[in-house]
Regions:
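Extended beta-strand/beta-hairpin segments
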Residues: 1-38, 46-127
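Alpha-helical metal-binding/catalytic segments enriched in His/Glu/Asp
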Residues: 43
Length: 127
C-alpha cells in the first residue's frame, strides 16, 4: 500500500475498488479510528455471514452496531469495541447463532489482530 499526502489535510490511497481518503478531520476523509472499527466490525460480520450460510441457517438480513470506547488521556486510543449483531430471520436457532458468533470471532483476522490490545465484546438480537 502507498499513501499520498493531500494538500489540504490527510492522505489518499488507491485500491481496485476506488480511492480512499483518510484524515484526522472528517471534512477531508475517513478518520483512522473509524476505519479500524469498520474493519473489525465488517470482517467479523462477513465471517459470521459465511458461517451462517455454510450451516444453512436461513436469515434475510445481518446488521452490526459498533459501540466504541476511546481513552482521550491516551491519544484517543480505542479501549473497547462492542459489536451487536442484529440478525433477521424466522425460527433462528439461538444456540447455533451463539456458536457461529464464537467461531466468527476466532476466524476474523482483523479481530484477532487486536485481541490483546482492544477489548472486543459481542452480543446479538434476533429480529
Amino acid at each position: 500500500m502507498e499513501f499520498n499526502m493531500k494538500k489540504e489535510a490527510g492522505f489518499t490511497t488507491n485500491f481496485p475498488y476506488g480511492e480512499l481518503h483518510i484524515a484526522g478531520d472528517e471534512e477531508y476523509g475517513f478518520r483512522p479510528y473509524q476505519l479500524m472499527v469498520s474493519s473489525i466490525a465488517v470482517c467479523s460480520g462477513g465471517v459470521l455471514r459465511k458461517i451462517l450460510e455454510k450451516k444453512r441457517i436461513a436469515f434475510s438480513d445481518l446488521r452490526i452496531q459498533a459501540d466504541v470506547t476511546r481513552n482521550d488521556e491516551k491519544a484517543g486510543r480505542i479501549e473497547k469495541i462492542h459489536l451487536h449483531y442484529i440478525i433477521t430471520g424466522e425460527d433462528l436457532p439461538l444456540d447455533k447463532i451463539e456458536k457461529s458468533i464464537e467461531l466468527a470471532r476466532k476466524n476474523c483476522s482483523m479481530l484477532q489482530s487486536v485481541i490483546n490490545s482492544i477489548e472486543v465484546t459481542e452480543t446479538f438480537k434476533i429480529k
